[in-house]
Swiss-Prot record:
Induction: Expression is enhanced during the late growth stage.
Entry protein name: ECF RNA polymerase sigma factor ShbA
Function: Sigma factors are initiation factors that promote the attachment of RNA polymerase to specific initiation sites and are then released. Extracytoplasmic function (ECF) sigma factors are held in an inactive form by an anti-sigma factor until released. This alternative sigma factor governs the transcription of the principal sigma factor HrdB (SigA) throughout growth. Acts by binding to the promoter region.
Region of interest called Disordered, as start-end residue ranges on this chain: 100-122
Molecular function GO labels: DNA binding; sigma factor activity
Similarity comment text for this entry: Belongs to the sigma-70 factor family. ECF subfamily.
GO biological process: one example: DNA-templated transcription initiation
Organism: Streptomyces griseus subsp. griseus (strain JCM 4626 / CBS 651.72 / NBRC 13350 / KCC S-0626 / ISP 5235)
Compositionally skewed regions (Basic and acidic residues) per UniProt: 112-122
Region listing for Sigma-70 factor domain-2, in residue ranges: 27-98
InterPro entries (UniProt xref): RNA_pol_sigma-70-like (IPR039425), RNA_pol_sigma-70_dom (IPR014284), RNA_pol_sigma70 (IPR000943), RNA_pol_sigma70_r2 (IPR007627), RNA_pol_sigma70_r4 (IPR007630), RNA_pol_sigma_r2 (IPR013325), RNA_pol_sigma_r3/r4-like (IPR013324), WH-like_DNA-bd_sf (IPR036388)
Keywords noted in UniProt: DNA-binding, Sigma factor, Transcription, Transcription regulation
């Protein structure tokens, strides 16, 4: 996220909190891609078919942001941190549901597809799945704060400055923590 985008979002938030409908619409147009990227990066770690819920979950995040706007108070942190916190809670809710009731996140359908399935075949999925399982296992050995930092930096694509604002750290501390997390992952991978 660029500084000018953060400035635009900040101005939209101020107007949306005051009840400006167009600003609210424009704000949600900025929030949705952020929520989508965050949810996609977090749900890739889920077992089963929960990944099909990425778009729905991003919409839920947008609705939750919309509902929370009238009560939103600027605390000096970027509005994006507020969005990521809501998204984190929504992802955690879905993860808990998926773990409690395996298979409950499947998406059954009685309809025939309109076009052929161009997705990966069984062998390719197995290879990707084993790599994903291996990465998931490695990430599980990291503390939650290091996992979250890596998700924001690597999967969501935030800069060190933006990640620092989200997590309440300086950009230098983010870089050091990222280096330590990646070093730890490298050591775990070599075991």
């Amino acid at each position: 996220m660029r500084d000018d985008e953060t400035t635009v979002i900040g101005a939209l938030v101020h107007r949306a909190v005051e009840g400006d409908a167009q600003a609210t619409h424009d704000l949600l147009a900025h929030v949705h891609p952020l929520a989508l990227r965050y949810c996609r990066s977090r749900l890739n770690r889920l077992p089963g078919d929960a990944r099909h819920f990425v778009e729905d979950l991003a919409q839920e995040v947008c609705v939750a942001v919309l509902m929370a706007l009238p009560r939103y108070k600027d605390t000096g942190r970027p509005f994006e941190a507020f969005v990521f916190a809501i998204a984190g809670h929504k992802v955690a809710d879905l993860q808990r549901a998926a773990m409690r009731h395996p298979g409950s996140t499947a998406v059954p359908s009685d309809e025939m597809p309109e076009r052929p399935d161009d997705s990966l075949g069984p062998e390719e999925r197995a290879l990707l799945s084993s790599d994903a399982a291996w990465a998931k296992k490695l990430l599980a050995n990291l503390p939650e704060n290091q996992r979250e930092l890596l998700v924001l930096r690597v999967a969501v694509g935030l800069t060190a400055e933006e990640t620092g604002q989200m997590l309440g750290m300086s950009p230098g501390a983010v870089r050091v923590a990222q280096h330590r997390a990646l070093s730890r992952l490298r050591a775990l991978a070599e075991q």
